[in-house]
UniProtKB/Swiss-Prot annotation:
Belongs to the TGF-beta family. Residues 21-240 form a propeptide. Pfam families: TGF_beta, TGFb_propeptide. It is found in: Secreted; Cytoplasm. SMART domains: TGFB (SM00204). Induction: By mesoderm-inducing factors including activin, basic fibroblast growth factor, nodal2/nr-2, dvr1/vg1, vegt and t/bra. Autoinduced by derriere itself. This is Growth/differentiation factor 3. Homodimer; disulfide-linked. Also forms heterodimers with other TGF-beta family members including nodal2/nr-2 and bmp4. Keywords: Cleavage on pair of basic residues, Cytokine, Cytoplasm, Developmental protein, Disulfide bond, Glycoprotein, Growth factor, Secreted, Signal. The keyword Disulfide bond applies.
Length: 354
């Protein structure tokens, strides 16, 4: 992971110098390391879910950085997907059916190496809506798509949830982890069907516009997933030293300040937060003899010893990070989904000779 950070650090530095190019090789490599194919360009970005904003502001739990405490599941990536489905027209009376909606969420951004630990569907109504009448909800998983012009067959669906509810100032949440896990394979993602009925007492056995209008006007659906990328996860972390390093000569290997401003690399339109971060970098000489302050490895100590004897044949050790820490990024991906992701080894805390 230290090698990955060094690559990211170098690419960030090069981007600061070469940002005049539309998309440089360094930027493509950096975006790939961040799990993106191209630079996102959100046109009509979705609002950031409060749950993601709260997790970002709370920060990473240094003792357990790969646990999403807000959801109680392992993970270091949270994505919020907007519904790309459509509302079906109800042309003929169908009892007390108020709404039929096809839901579709594109999970193609989830990589094969990720372990999906939570899939949560949210059905939200306008916040100032309050109606006391009761409705009935049925949620189906589509097993097979119907041909255009053909009736939706009940044989092509599987009932997942049935629930009664009232329109209150809160959302409805449903655990769809198993379904979302299957959707990592696009061939299995046929979407969902949501049906909402008015209670038969209020609807009088037939659909009533007055009763159904609140549902049709104010419904909003989204899907949230939590996944774990094992390659970007450390289960144990040494606690950061609280004492400050003693003064050192300016040419000796040590941590130097480097602030990365995402506006400087042209990323301000898709990176939601932070606006930038203190990345730092390592620079300086590793002279003989290495002192304890330089945190040299055994190999580096031997290398400096050999260099003192044969300076022309053996170079001095390199100044490199010996301790790094993670950051969280909140951003829009290539599908305009909101993503919260923890990245290991993005901040240099200490440097040494290697």
């Amino acid at each position: 992971m230290a090698e990955l950070w060094l690559s990211l650090s170098c690419m960030f530095s090069l981007l600061l110098l070469t940002n005049s190019s539309p998309l440089t090789f360094q930027e493509r490599m950096l975006l790939k390391a961040l799990g993106l194919n191209t630079r996102p360009n959100p046109i009509a970005p979705a609002p950031v879910p409060k749950s993601l904003r709260d997790i970002f502001e709370k920060g990473i739990n240094q003792d357990n950085p790969c646990m999403m405490e807000g959801f109680g599941v392992p993970g270091n990536i949270v994505r919020s997907y907007r519904d790309q489905g459509t509302i079906a027209a109800i042309e003929e009376p169908q009892g007390s059916l108020c709404l039929k909606k096809f839901l579709f969420f594109d999970l193609s951004a989830v990589e094969n190496k990720e372990q999906l630990t939570l899939g949560q569907l949210e059905i939200k109504f306008k916040h100032n809506t309050y109606y006391g009448q009761q409705f009935h909800l049925r949620l189906y998983r589509t097993l097979q798509l119907s041909l255009k012009g053909m009736r939706d067959s009940k044989m092509n669906r599987k009932l997942l949830v049935t629930q009664s509810f009232r329109l209150l100032h809160k959302s409805l949440y449903f655990n769809l982890t198993k379904v979302a896990e299957d959707w990592k394979n696009p061939e299995k993602n046929m979407g969902l069907i949501l049906e909402i009925y008015a209670s038969s007492e209020l609807a009088g056995g037939n659909r009533s516009f007055v009763v159904c209008e609140p549902i049709q006007s104010f419904i909003y659906t989204s899907l949230l997933t939590v996944s774990l990328d094992p390659s970007n996860c450390k289960t144990q972390r040494a606690k950061r030293s609280t004492h400050s390093s003693p003064p050192t000569p300016s040419n000796i290997c040590k941590k130097r300040r480097l602030y990365i401003d995402f506006k400087d690399v042209g990323w301000q339109n898709w990176v939601i937060a932070p606006r930038g971060y203190m990345a730092n970098y390592c620079h300086g000489e590793c002279p003989y003899p290495l002192t304890e302050m330089l945190r040299g490895t055994n190999h580096a100590v031997l290398q400096t010893l050999v260099h003192s004897v044969e300076p022309e044949n053996t170079p001095l050790p390199c100044c490199a990070p010996t301790k790094l820490s993670p950051i969280s990024m909140l951003y829009y991906d290539n599908n305009d989904n909101v993503v919260l992701r923890h990245y290991e080894d993005m901040v240099v805390d200490e440097c040494g000779c290697k």
